[in-house]
Amino acid sequence: MARIIRVGGASSETSWHEALKDLRADDVLMLGPGFYYLPQGLTLTDITIKGTGSVPEDTTIEGYISVSEDSRYVTLENLCINTSTDNNSLFVPVESDGYLTLRNCFVKGNGTDTAAIAVNGKITVELYSTKVINGSVSMYANASFRLEMNDSLIDYKSDKYCALAIEGQGTAIINNSNIHGSINTFAKTNAELDINNSEADYILLHGQTWMNMLNSTVRAKDDSCLYLSDDCWSNIMNSKFNGGVYIDKKTRTIIQNCTINRMVVINEAKVTMSNSMVTAHSDFQDEATCEATRVSFMGNMNYEYFLALSGNAHLRGHDLLLHPNGADLAIQDEAKLHTNVIADKDEKLSVECNKRPNVYILGIQWTAKKK
């Protein structure tokens, strides 16, 4: 039978260490405000721990926690876990098969390459109104996972490590959350990634990743704030990218109602775009193809070309809007452009091309030139 055990505060029934010695499956441990020390860590099996303070930091566990191999669930609520040693704040072993749930928690890693939350095995991880700082949330290669992240924050900006690492097999759902750092998948990843109403600094996808992205923002202004590679499939809607979108290899990408600063598409990547805007520079190379409908390709003085095609790239457009803003359009090598244009700020368009028959633009006066 489940027991409610109170530790700390006026209604305390037992001491912290006595409670730990007598923990049983399905116990609910109620911790009053204060600091609770676990220098050797703690392994939990089918336990719920709740802080009774007004905010998570009122009830702080100094140390680290592991989920046992045979645990069905571990639930933590209204707690702060502060890990100052080189340990995972929360660790899920390979043999696990259960749930790890955090509600209104604050997890502090030690700021090294050690993940704050390390996930292996078969596990559902639920983060609700939870903050993770100074460490990553990492799904490792041997994990079969489901991650649900709602109204939560991961704050781990690093030039070497990502804030949310997704390897292994599973599904990650990120709703109304904020990632200060990068979201990464890897060569061995086989996962679905759903990002809704959220923000991240970078998103870098590899392996076999299926991404659905809605009403979200990627903040970084670097050339690859969004990087799609390998065999990734992506469906992106109503989102904004402050930097560059870089797409390569055999990716398949659908972009709808989005604003992108600049984009580069190479190799055998295929892109379908509609009702979107690229504000500075677009570059299609190699065997890349793009179907674009009601897309605005714009330029600025930072780039020689506002739109460039080379190799055997092919852009087929429908009702495009071209705004060069002083930049040129380049169709090089065997690349082809076939489109009609419905609006343009300039009366004339200058097209740098090697083979005039490879350029078909209807709806605007254009002039071919050689570099």
Segments (PLM) and residue ranges:
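All-beta strand scaffolds that present successive hydrophobic residues in beta-strands
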Residues: T48-G51, Y73-N78, L100-N104, T124-L127, ...
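Right-handed parallel beta-helix/beta-spiral solenoid domain characteristic of secreted/periplasmic
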Residues: G8-S12, D46-V92, G109-G111, K221
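Right-handed parallel beta-helix
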Residues: C80-A172, N176-I179, T185-T189
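A general structural motif
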Residues: A2, D26, D46, S71-Y73, ...
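Leucine-rich solenoid repeat scaffolds
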Residues: L321-K371
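Acidic Gly/Asp/Thr-rich repetitive segments characteristic of extracellular carbohydrate-active
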Residues: A2-G32, Y37
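Short, T/G/N/S-enriched strand-turn elements that build extracellular solenoid repeat scaffolds
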Residues: S15-L23, Y36-L44, I61-E69, N88-E95, ...
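Extracellular beta-sheet-rich ligand-binding/adhesion modules
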Residues: I4-G8, Q40, T45-D46, E57-I65, ...
